[in-house]
């Protein structure tokens, strides 16, 4: 089964699978990122939009959110829930982001990066759409090991969707042009941050 079909078929019930504790972890991670008021943020791999209310709260009405996903039914679920004047939904792939060069200040990618078909190309595209001084944040509300074990156990379309080792992830983003790359991998969170200087 193609990954797009896998996520489209699960879209209607996706939100019921997200535990409250996971939402709280994501809120904490976003608070630590301290997204500047007024910034334009790309939510890459938005899914059903779990981060959208948190992002809107962070950037305020003077900021903006572009939420992109490759699975149209996941996007449809997000659009049912959220309408703000500074929120835009786009269907698209991480390897070919439908935005102009230097379009956003921040790219946040929650629980989506290992699902991209070409991680190197996705990192290059993230770099392209970020403004100079911009930041990428790859988030998971679980450890790398937990995510990889989960995907392996689920099998099917996601069985090979793995977060690479830290040195590989560092190389993927460094080769795309990012600097000041940091990776935190602990029991209840995984965060990679990089800057376009």
Model-identified regions with their sequence ranges:
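Short alpha-helix
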Residues: 161-176
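Conserved class I S-adenosyl-L-methionine
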Residues: 1-37, 50-54, 73-77, 137-161, ...
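A short acidic, Gly/Pro-enriched loop at the edge of an enzyme's catalytic core
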Residues: 95-106
């Amino acid at each position: 089964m193609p990954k797009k079909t896998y996520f489209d078929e699960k879209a209607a019930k996706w939100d019921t699978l997200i535990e409250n504790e996971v939402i709280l972890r994501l809120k904490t991670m976003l608070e630590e990122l301290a997204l500047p008021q007024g910034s334009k943020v790309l939510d890459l791999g938005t899914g059903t939009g779990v981060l959208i209310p948190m992002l809107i709260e962070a950037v305020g009405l003077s900021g903006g959110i572009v939420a992109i996903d490759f699975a149209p039914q996941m996007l449809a679920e997000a659009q049912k829930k959220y309408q703000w004047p500074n929120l835009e939904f786009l269907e698209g792939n991480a390897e070919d982001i439908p935005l102009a060069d230097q379009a956003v200040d921040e790219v946040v990618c929650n629980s989506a990066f290992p699902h991209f078909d070409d991680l190197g190309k996705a990192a290059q595209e993230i770099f392209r759409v970020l403004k100079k001084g911009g930041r990428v944040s790859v988030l998971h509300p679980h450890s790398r090991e937990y995510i990889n074990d989960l995907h392996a156990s689920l099998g099917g379309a996601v069985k090979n969707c793995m977060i690479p080792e830290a040195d590989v992830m560092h190389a993927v983003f460094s080769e795309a042009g990012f600097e000041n790359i940091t990776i935190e991998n602990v029991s209840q969170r995984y965060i990679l941050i990089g800057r376009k200087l």
